[in-house]
Amino acid sequence: MSYNSSYIYEHLEPEGFIPDEISLISKGKNSRSFLIKKENKNFLLKYYKTDDFIKRNRLKAELNFLNLMIKGGFKNVPIPIKFNIEKNWILLSWLNGNNIEKINKSHIRKLIFFINELQSLRKSELINTIQNASEACFNLNDHIKIVFSRLNLLEKRLGYLSFLPSDTYEKFK
């Protein structure tokens, strides 16, 4: 699938959203992300792959989770502006930020705080409004295992992860 500018305009114009500028941000395994500029405002446009071997709709899953977080009081969550389930795209408000080049203790603390906040949603009736994600976690240990599983993949790609105490990391390998 070619996600060129004319392809994107084809999808956004019928929705009444005509971008001034379109730039590719990333080509991930599950989606393509674009920075969309319109009237001096930034937006994020994501196209999800349709050939998902998991056979679940990633767009619906993300949309449901974003709505859960918004209803749950999270403030640093992109807001869905427009979406098209059939064409597999979503337009979101833009959140300013920077890429993390090197993980430090502050990043880890923020991640732990975020996971704790997510855990608070478990007690909410809102949690029953979404399906489980492919890496759904229902307790802190599940979150920790997922994080260390991802760190293991990162270590294989980048080498030793010096920001973690080796004895802590070894327990989860």
Whereabouts are the PLM-identified features?
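Catalytic cores of nucleotide-enabled group-transfer and carboxylate-activating enzymes in metabolic
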Residues: 46-49, 86-89, 116-124, 135, ...
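Active-site catalytic-loop/activation-segment of kinase and kinase-like phosphoryl-transfer enzymes
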Residues: 90, 131-173
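Conserved short submotifs of the Hanks-type protein kinase catalytic core
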Residues: 87-98
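Juxta-kinase regulatory segment immediately upstream of eukaryotic protein kinase catalytic domains
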Residues: 1-23
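Glycine-rich phosphate/pyrophosphate-binding loop shared by adenosine-nucleotide-utilizing enzymes
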Residues: 40-43
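Conserved kinase catalytic-core helix
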Residues: 98-133, 137
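A conserved alpha-helical element in kinase catalytic cores
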Residues: 45-83, 102-114
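ATP-binding glycine-rich phosphate-binding loop
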Residues: 15-38
